[in-house]
Structures are given as C-alpha cells and as structure tokens.
Amino acid sequence: MLIHPEINPVALQLGPLAIHWYGLTYLAAFGLFFFLASLRLRHEPYASITGPGAWSRRDIEDILFLGVMGVVIGGRLGYCLFYKPGYYLTHPLEIFAVWQGGMSFHGGMLGVLVSQWWFARSRQRPWLQVMDFIAPCVPTGLAAGRVGNFINGELWGRFSAPDLPWGMVFAHSGSMLPRHPSQVYQFLMEGLLLFVLLWLYARKPRKMGQVSGAFLVGYGVFRFIAEFFREPDDFLGILALGMSMGQWLCVPMIAAGIWLWIWASNRTSRR
C-alpha cells in the first residue's frame, strides 16, 4: 500500500503571486501541443497539402490560441452544465469563479470543436482536415492534466483491494483505506497509450475524418474503462445502468467516432 505524498499544490510563491503546479501542467500541455504540431507539419500528409494554401507555423499558432480559448471556456461551461446545472442556474456568477476548480474534458472538447470550426472557416479549409491534424497532438496534453490531478491529490479512485501493491491512500478523500490511483491509470491510457496509437496511425496518409474518428473512439473507450476505477463525483454518484456521468458522456462520443470513421472510410478522397 502506498501513501499519496501530499505535494504542495503551489509550485512557486513570488510575493502575493502563487504559481500552482496545475497551471504549470496546462502550460506543459500547450507547449507539447505546439511541439508535436510542428513535427506533424514536416511530415505527410500535411507537408503536401496545399489547398487552399500551404500549412504554416502561423496556422499552428492560431490553432493553439483558439484551442486554449475553447478548452478553458468549453471546459468550464461543460462542468457547469453536465455536472452541476441546478447549482449554477441559481448561482450564475459563480460560473466565472474558475479558481474554485471544476473543468470538464467533454466540455473542453466541444469548445475545441467550435474554436477549430472557426479556424477552418477563416482559412477556408475543411474542418475535418484541421481536426485530423490536431487530434494526435492532444493526448499528451491530457496526460499533463492527469499529472496535475495527481499532484493535487484530487479525482482519486474507488476503494481497491487491501493487498493491491499500488493501492494508494489519499488523505483528502476522508478515508485511510487504499484506493486505485485512477489519475495514473488515465495518464497511462488516455495520455501515453492513446498518444502512441494515434501518432502511429496518423503517420500514414488517411482519408479525411479517419484520424478524428479514431481519436473519439480511443479516448471514449479508455475513459469509459478508467471510470470503473475512478470515484464518481459525490454530488452525482452512480447513474442509470450503474454508469457514471463520465461513462454516459463517453457513449455518444464512441458512437460518433465509429460513425465518423466508417463514413470517412467510404470516401473516395483522402482530403
């Protein structure tokens, strides 16, 4: 049995300014995205895509800027709407209290979809071409976010078997019984494993929409599995059919990914 180290969430204190580890993981996520997107720009199929114009470093900068806006706004609104709609309907001003925590991946994903639709429209590019470009660069950012969750000792897992070698006690959970370190599970599955699989899959020319479909299915499946080990939000608990809110949100995501991949596979054009 392991004990969570209870790391100070503040990485650096500069007078009244507190720099949190969680904020640094967000910076790491955006930095990794820019690095990986730059690598993608040098390789097929994007190195040879010229219509309606060659891809450039400026494109990546704009994609990242709009993506950050989509993640923050969509993630916050998604949390408020998916997890605590009743509370935020009666306390609407607290939607802006982002320092209190509360972000949703599924909401952030919707925010990114909208922001990249705007980018694609402004560049007169196919929206799916843009999404296929960025999809393999996303999992490392998810991995960085799970590192932040672990450092904060939040989003811990359900109770594990007492003899599980990596079972971990999280002091903030209110119990001294070992739990699954679900943040680590998600780091490995939604972060590293999904990144490797998607990066390798996307290195070969694919029909437009296939990479995006593969991402939706891959993330949805890994998140669905991880939810069996993650402690449900105490204000929601387990919902219909014994599934958590995270799992219910993954169901349409997986279905959409399967549909998109099949639809893209039946297309005659790769772009």
Curated annotation (Swiss-Prot):
Q: Where in the cell is it found?
A: Cell inner membrane
Recorded GO MF terms: phosphatidylglycerol-prolipoprotein diacylglyceryl transferase activity
Instruction: Give the transmembrane region(s).
Output: 17-37, 63-83, 95-115, 182-202, 209-229, 243-263
Any Pfam family the entry gives? LGT
Q: Which residues bind a 1,2-diacyl-sn-glycero-3-phospho-(1'-sn-glycerol)?
A: R146
**Membrane topology reported for the UniProt record:** Multi-pass membrane protein
UniProt pathway annotation = Protein modification; lipoprotein biosynthesis (diacylglyceryl transfer)
Question: Principal localization?
Answer: membrane
Q: Name one GO biological process term.
A: lipoprotein biosynthetic process
Q: Which InterPro entries match?
A: Lgt
Q: What is its EC number?
A: 2.5.1.145
Keywords, A to Z, come to: Cell inner membrane, Cell membrane, Membrane, Transferase, Transmembrane, Transmembrane helix
What is this protein for, i.e. what is its function? Catalyzes the transfer of the diacylglyceryl group from phosphatidylglycerol to the sulfhydryl group of the N-terminal cysteine of a prolipoprotein, the first step in the formation of mature lipoproteins.
Tell me which HAMAP family the record gives: Lgt
Q: Which family does it belong to?
A: Belongs to the Lgt family.
Name recorded for this polypeptide: Phosphatidylglycerol--prolipoprotein diacylglyceryl transferase
Gene that specifies this protein: lgt
